[in-house]
A protein has these predicted regions:
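Conserved PLP-enzyme active-site core in the AAT-like
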Residues: 1-145, 152
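Broad gene-expression machinery/nucleic-acid interaction feature
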Residues: 50-52, 176, 236-238
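PLP-dependent enzyme catalytic core of the Aspartate aminotransferase-like
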Residues: 1, 127, 193, 209-263
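Active-site beta-loop-alpha junctions enriched in small/polar residues
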Residues: 19-21, 156, 182, 242-244
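Short hydrophobic/aromatic beta-strand micro-patches
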Residues: 56, 178-180, 240-242
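Residues that form or flank phosphate/diphosphate-binding pockets in enzymes
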Residues: 23, 186, 248
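Conserved small-domain helix->loop->beta segment predominantly found in fold-type I
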Residues: 105-108, 112-114, 119, 123, ...
Length: 263
């Protein structure tokens, strides 16, 4: 089943953010995507040390058909009337980005940052395998823990996207997920405050295991009703599972639960 809706009905390219999926676990273009974007700061770089992004163009989208993309399809006066769609063909979109957007905004990654991201790709498959393996064990641990109300992970049979997860992610995935601890905000804070291996940080997809309380940080501008619409509650905790030894990760989580119990 392709991801792509009918192009004739929308006239728009299908753009997929594959930051969390990574090219190692899923390649959206093979499923009908026209353009794929990544925040390379996450899994591709792997260590949270630099900022960068990637755009991958399938070259399959017709930028002239709908008449909606004059900046790419029509003659461009700043390039002597050249139409990027005609001159660059399948590379029209990425050529437009390089020739126009980079020219106008000056967004240029430094050589050292580029080096860090390229270096990260050398260990991408190795790291993702470990992220996935650790995540499976953490999900199992949490799903069977008496102090956990709910685990939100597509690998679990009761998750609404479980069938899609099994179809598109046969090698696993989703090392960033949330769970609801039994109790409320106080229990969530106590749990987080007593973790040692997990770092309390807002970023994700790092070799380091990370934890945060979304309701008071990333989504703090929302009221309780708006939070609930996003399935975020005062007892919701977000985890980003790293590549540490699984025994250390599980022991750290259990220490957090023990602190909530007053032990």
């Amino acid at each position: 089943m392709p991801l792509q809706p009918s192009r004739t009905s929308t006239g728009l390219p299908l753009v997929i953010d594959n930051t969390f999926g990574t090219p190692y676990l899923i390649r959206p273009i093979e499923h009908g995507a026209d353009i794929v974007v990544h925040s390379a700061t996450k899994f591709i770089g792997g260590h949270g040390t630099t900022l960068g992004g990637i755009i991958v163009d399938s070259g399959k989208f017709d930028w002239k058909a709908s008449g909606k993309f004059g900046n790419i399809a029509d003659p461009n006066p700043s390039y002597h009337g050249v139409s990027f769609a005609d001159a660059a063909g399948p590379a029209a979109f990425v050529t437009y980005i390089r020739a126009i957007l980079l020219r106008d905004t000056g967004a240029t990654i430094s050589p050292f940052n580029a080096f860090l991201l390229l270096q990260g790709t050398e260990t991408l498959s190795l790291r993702i395998e470990r992220h996935v393996e650790n995540s499976k064990k953490v999900v199992e641990f949490l799903a069977n823990h008496p102090q956990v109300e709910k685990v939100n992970h597509p690998s679990l049979p009761d998750h609404p996207d479980h069938a899609l997860y099994e179809k598109y992610f046969p090698n696993g995935g989703a090392s960033i997920f949330t769970f609801n601890i039994k109790g409320g905000r106080e229990e969530a804070f106590k749990f987080i405050d007593n973790l040692k291996v997990f770092s309390l940080l807002a970023n994700v997809a790092d070799v380091k295991s990370l934890v945060i309380h979304p309701a008071s940080t990333t989504h703090s501008q929302l009221n309780d009703e708006e939070l609930a619409e996003q399935q975020i509650y005062q007892n919701t905790i977000r985890l980003s599972i790293g590549t540490e030894h699984i025994d250390d990760i599980i022991a750290d989580l259990e220490a957090g639960f023990a602190a909530v119990r007053g032990e």
